[in-house]
Structure formats: C-alpha cells, structure tokens
Amino acid sequence: MVMGHGLGANREMGLDRYARRFAAAGMAVLVFDYRHFGASQGTPRQLLSIGRQREDWHAAIAFARTLRGIDATRIALWGTSFGGGHVLSVAPDDAYIAAVVAQVPFTSGLSSALAKGPISTIKVATIAAVDLLLGPIRRKPIGIRLAGRKRAAALMSAPDVPEGFRRLTDESETYEPKVAARVAFSALFDAPGRRAKALKMPVLYALCDDDSVAPVKSALRAAERTKHAVVKRYPAGHFDIYFDEVFEKTVYDQTEFLVSVLRP
C-alpha cells in the first residue's frame, strides 16, 4: 500500500492512523511526503506542483517494488483529497496497480472553484497572478493560505475548513500554513476525474455527502465512469473522515475492500 496526503499536507497529518490499521490487516504500508513538503527535500519549500507530485507517486511506487518481500503486482494506491485526485490520475499509467482508494478525492478544479464561490476565487486568482509574475523575479514564491473561512483568500475556503483542517495540522510538527500561490491556476484546470474511464483496477471511492472542498457530485461522476468502482458515502464533511466515528467506519470499509482485492 502506497499512501499520500492532500493539498499542502504531510504524512504526519492523520495518515498514521490509517497505516496502522492497514498494517494490522497484513499489508505492508509506505507513506511518503511530496517533495518541498514535510520530511522530504526540495527547494523552495512549500512549492506545490501537480506534475511533480504525480512524479513523486510514480517514484514511491517504483521504490515500493524494490523492497524485499513485496509482490510488485499487488500494490494498491491510497490518496486523500488532492492526493485522491493524484491516484486517479497516476493509476492508469501503471498496468500492475492492483487497487485504488480515492478518499474525498479532488476530481475537478472547476467544480471546487464553483463550490468556493466567486469572491474567494477572485481573491485567490489575484494572489496567484502576482506569484506567477513576481515570484521568479524575487526568487521566492508568494504564499497563499491553505485554509480559510468562506470568501477568504485561501485555497480551501468554507465555514468548516478552519477548524477541520486545524485538527489535522495540530498533529504535524512540520506543517506550514501557506503554499506558493501559483498552483491555483494549474489546479483550476486540473480534472483527475476525466481519467476515470482509464482505470481498469477496482477503485473504492470514499465520499462525504457534506464535502465543502471536493464536491461529491463531481466525484460521483468520476465513479460512474470507473469500470470497477465501489462507492461508499458518509453523512459527513471533508475533514470529518479523518476522525472519530467517521474514521472508524471508513477505515473498516477500506480495509475490507483492500483485503478482498489484494488477498493472494
């Protein structure tokens, strides 16, 4: 099992809970940080590049296959939020990926922008444009907040975002609250859900009905295009899935799915 987190997040932010459960079920688990974030190298720090992060997924998969005792044909990918979009995009490129778990996945930048509303989107676009123009000149990215309330100049902005994201960031010693703003433009036009038709392996979509960050309707459209899709829906918000009863239910469902697919 290869696991990666979401937007501006690192492996300290809740992934250990999932990894322990999967390991207890008999799976070997590799959890990694994207370059420029957390424990990984890469400068400038907090540079969020969609292309580089997907390259990191391929690198992590390749590394997992070098580990002793690992069956190279029974590797699963687990991604959450922005990472959920990454696994939908990366998995079709590897014919030997056995299963995918896409938890509250980012499937359409346009859908997420519409959920944010015009005020927040305009604020974010303005800062992103300044970063694109001036960042290279000053040799240092211009940052934008990852989380904020509705209408805030933040990549994720909704009433439940500040408190929900804070619960995750409190678990990390390396978390930084801002990333290079330029990613807003590439994220807007990114649509990992479009690759759903190319997914040949079983895919579990773990979706929250009250998701204010990764709209559930967009994820359901991706699931409909997935040949071997399993959809699990929970009456919860985007960040609720990492904690308490919702976590217990989702990790049970995910473990059951993974064991059934990966069992020799």
Question: Can you say where each PLM-predicted feature lies in the sequence?
Answer:
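Short beta-strand element of the alpha/beta-hydrolase
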Residues: 1-6
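The serine-hydrolase catalytic nucleophile loop
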Residues: 7-20, 34, 217
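Catalytic nucleophile-loop/oxyanion-hole region of alpha/beta-hydrolase
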Residues: 11-14, 37-72, 76, 243-250
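Alpha/beta-hydrolase-fold enzymes
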Residues: 88-168
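Short beta-strand/loop motif that positions the catalytic acidic residue
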Residues: 199, 205-207, 211
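Conserved alpha/beta-hydrolase "acid-adjacent" motif
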Residues: 212-218
